[in-house]
């Protein structure tokens, strides 16, 4: 558990840590995940600190979903995919946030319950190169502007 003074996402929302922002509103910001599942993987993060998604006030939850819905067609266009996935985890950082992921493969977002062979070893996704993040952010912002 963390508080807003040390929370990574709170610090990003306050502008203390740089990010590749693609959209923002009074309640939330959207920026690229630096360890993306796929290029264009966006995090939608409330500006206010909430440890769990079920703690979100209704207006904040609505805004997070509104931004995710706004991003989906922009990601389909800018990343050249047919489907965009949306999920909440709250596993790595104790600050409620949504993942909006351009899906290249149906298994880009899955559950271990569907895995036929075990054991599996999981580790963090590799850091995306800064240039790739900059290019993706520019493409997504462009697609948002064209919407």
Locate each region found by the language model.
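HIT superfamily nucleotide-processing domains
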Residues: 1-147
């Amino acid at each position: 558990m963390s508080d807003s003074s040390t929370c990574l996402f709170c610090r990003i929302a306050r502008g203390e840590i740089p990010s590749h922002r693609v959209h923002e509103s009074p309640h939330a910001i959207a920026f690229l995940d630096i360890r993306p599942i796929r290029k264009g993987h966006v995090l939608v993060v409330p500006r206010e600190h909430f440890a769990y998604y079920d703690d979100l006030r209704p207006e904040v939850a609505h805004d997070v979903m509104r931004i995710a819905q706004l991003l989906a067609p922009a990601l389909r266009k800018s990343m050249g995919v047919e489907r965009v996935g949306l999920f909440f985890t709250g596993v790595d950082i104790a600050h409620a946030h949504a993942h909006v992921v351009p899906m290249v493969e149906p298994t880009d977002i899955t559950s271990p319950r569907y895995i036929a062979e075990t054991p599996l070893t999981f580790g963090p996704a590799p850091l995306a190169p800064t240039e790739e993040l900059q290019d993706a952010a520019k493409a997504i912002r462009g697609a948002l502007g064209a919407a």
